[in-house]
UniProtKB/Swiss-Prot annotation:
A Pfam family this chain is assigned to: Complex1_30kDa
Topological relation to the membrane, as annotated: Peripheral membrane protein
GO biological process: photosynthesis, light reaction
Subcellular location: Cellular thylakoid membrane
The species this protein was found in: Synechococcus sp. (strain RCC307)
Protein name: NAD(P)H-quinone oxidoreductase subunit J
Length: 176
């Protein structure tokens, strides 16, 4: 049996290409990572926590003035936690279509889990950032209401983390 020899570069995944928003941000001097497009073709850009308000402000000035969703996800045990903002340009530059972009901030789970809040820029981030804090433990500095939204104030842990250990005992409060 003969196997075809493969070159070492043949097995490497192709690096994501810069999309139009990435190219525009680069031309404006904003540092970011090209994460490629998601399954719907939406451009994903990685930004450092301190650069998030600057990049979001630049995108808002370009017409991405609607925060469709903010959330978080856990990439798995030992992997980073991610806070993301999905921005939409309604009407697009041609007046008819829409454009979308997702900003992602990766945070080492054993490091500083703080991201500047985008509440001053997008008021709709209020409850969404609180929910992400509540379920993943990502803090949003500068948020005007930094408290739990879904879980009781004395709840220990963050239920949507993949390393979360569910408590064995629940004390139910009597409604009467």
């Amino acid at each position: 049996m003969s196997e075809t020899p493969t070159s070492p570069n043949q097995d490497l995944p192709e690096a994501p290409q810069a999309g139009p928003l990435s190219q525009w941000l680069t031309s404006q001097g904003f540092d970011h990572q090209i994460l490629g497009n998601d399954h719907l073709g939406i451009e994903r850009l990685g930004v450092e926590p301190l650069a998030l308000p600057l990049v979001a402000t630049a995108l808002k000035s370009k017409g991405f003035d609607y925060l469709q969703v903010q959330g978080g996800f856990d990439q798995g045990p030992g992997e980073p936690l991610v806070s993301f903002y999905h921005l939409v340009q309604v009407g697009g530059s041609d007046g008819a279509s829409t454009a979308e972009v997702r900003l992602e901030v990766s945070l080492a789970r054993d490091g500083d889990l703080t991201v500047p809040s985008l509440y001053p820029l997008f008021r709709g981030a209020d409850w969404q950032e609180r929910e992400t804090f509540d379920l993943f433990g990502i803090n949003y500095s500068g948020h005007p209401h930094p408290k739990r939204l879904l879980m009781p104030e004395d709840w220990v842990g963050y239920p949507l983390r993949k390393d979360y250990v569910q408590p064995d005992f629940y004390e139910l409060q009597d409604a009467y």
